[in-house]
A protein has these predicted regions:
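Macromolecular interaction modules
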Residues: 1-227
Length: 227
């Protein structure tokens, strides 16, 4: 409707042109069933904190050259949001996070969207907490022992980014970038299971000790800029 025409025709192009912004992508998120990705896996845990907004249907990713792009004094992004409060009032029940990259791992399809060259055609973003010091260390070790090696060989994956937050509820974030999500896909997780490399991780399953933001992870296809 009129909001999408304004968002795609005016606001997001202006955001992409703001000082310090590298690229912007708007994604239509796919609903996922409330069951484990594979039989026998732990059930994903979500926060029940009423202060955390529960919207999930759309994600706008904005890549900046530094956190100053979003948090520095007198930045263009703040000014743009302040100038468009009427249009942005349509963004109900939404939440924001500012992340920095902890680790970037290229996948087999890296050539499709080289680093820094724009938003991927499809993506999955997760935001979550590991609530104890010990669990945060477990999480860091698991990513390095199992998930990062799999990203490098997972079908259709451009790259994976592990992130840490500057603002927002979640301490941890991940952004998995892909060439596509098929008509029956709602997650990249089955591809990571396919890509097992005999890692023999001896620790607990990651879902046993992380708490996701509402609806996280969110997987979707890019709707702006059009694929």
């Amino acid at each position: 409707g009129a909001h999408w025409a304004w968002l795609h025709g005016e606001f997001l192009p202006a955001l992409q042109s703001a000082s310090g912004v590298a690229w912007v992508g708007h994604y239509d998120i796919i609903a996922h069933p409330d069951r484990p990705y594979i039989e026998g896996a732990p059930t994903r845990q979500e926060t029940t904190d009423p202060a955390i907004a529960t919207g999930w249907q759309n994600v706008v990713l904005t890549a900046g050259v530094s956190t100053n792009t979003f948090l520095g004094p007198d930045n263009d992004v703040d000014a743009l949001f302040a100038a468009h409060t009427t249009g942005l009032a349509a963004w109900q029940n939404h939440r924001t996070c500012t992340f920095i990259e902890e680790k970037v791992v290229n996948g087999p399809e890296e050539r499709v969207t080289p680093y820094g060259m724009g938003p991927p055609p499809a993506m999955q973003i997760g935001s979550f907490n590991a609530d104890t010091t010990a669990n945060n260390e477990l999480l860091a070790r698991w990513y390095r022992a199992e998930r990062f090696p799999r990203i490098a060989v997972s079908r259709g994956i451009i790259r994976g980014r592990k992130m840490l937050s500057i603002t927002g509820w979640a301490k941890h974030g991940v952004l998995w970038e892909g060439t596509e999500l098929g008509p029956d896909d709602y997650s990249f997780e089955p591809r990571f299971i396919e890509a097992a490399r005999d890692e023999n991780w001896a620790g607990p399953h990651v879902l046993e000790y992380v708490t996701h933001a509402p609806g996280s992870p969110h997987a979707g296809r890019r709707v702006w800029p059009k694929v």
